[in-house]
């Protein structure tokens, strides 16, 4: 399987995702659209991973818009997609959701709490690194997956293929 990763900062790479891919014999390719504006072709993608970053989906960068086009194309191809932080915001916005300033900043490690058992084996509570103030709408047809003490929408699952 070819896993294409969209990385949005030089310091926040695929980490455990890379290890999992290597252990399971998958090919992993990392793209830096913020730096070069280059994105993978959906035809050369078996799974799409969109990582976090300091920007907002509402920033006026052409590469952010093209990234959402890629997300929509991957959804149309029924590819598995995983988005973390900015990645989840980009998926929500690509599906017509609103991303806006939440009025609160979440910075540092804090727990998120499981709200759905749509994905088997997830813990009821897990400590994750937060570094954001934007919040996203849960897309139509998706199910709330995680919430934190400060923000209800911390993660969602859709059609068991988009997380």
Predicted regions and their residues:
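Short alpha-helical
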Residues: 11-12, 89, 107, 151
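Compositionally biased, intrinsically disordered low-complexity segments enriched
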Residues: 9, 91, 132-134
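Cysteine-nucleophile active-site neighborhood
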Residues: 50-118
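Pocket-forming structural segment of enzyme catalytic cores
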Residues: 95-163
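Active-site-adjacent beta-strand anchor residues
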Residues: 7, 84, 129
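N-terminal beta1-alpha1 cap of cysteine-dependent amidohydrolase-like domains
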Residues: 1-79
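Short glycine-/acidic-enriched loop or helix-start segments at secondary-structure transitions
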Residues: 15-16, 59-60, 92-94, 140, ...
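Short active-site oxyanion
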Residues: 2-3, 78-80, 143, 161-163
């Amino acid at each position: 399987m070819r896993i294409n990763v969209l990385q949005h900062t030089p310091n926040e790479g695929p980490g455990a995702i890379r290890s999992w891919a290597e252990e399971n014999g998958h090919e992993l390719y990392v793209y830096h659209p913020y730096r070069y504006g280059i994105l993978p072709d959906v035809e050369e993608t078996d799974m799409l991973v969109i990582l976090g970053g300091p920007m907002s989906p509402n920033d006026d960068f052409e590469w952010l818009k093209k990234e959402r086009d890629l997300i929509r194309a991957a959804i149309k191809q029924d590819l598995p997609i995983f988005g973390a932080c900015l990645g989840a915001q980009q998926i929500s916005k690509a599906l017509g959701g609103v991303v806006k300033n939440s009025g609160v900043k979440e910075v540092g490690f804090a727990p998120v709490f499981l709200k759905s058992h749509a994905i088997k084996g997830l813990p009821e509570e897990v400590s994750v690194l937060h570094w954001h103030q934007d919040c996203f709408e849960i897309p139509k047809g998706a199910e709330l997956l995680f919430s934190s003490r400060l923000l209800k929408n911390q993660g969602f699952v859709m059609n068991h293929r988009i997380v």
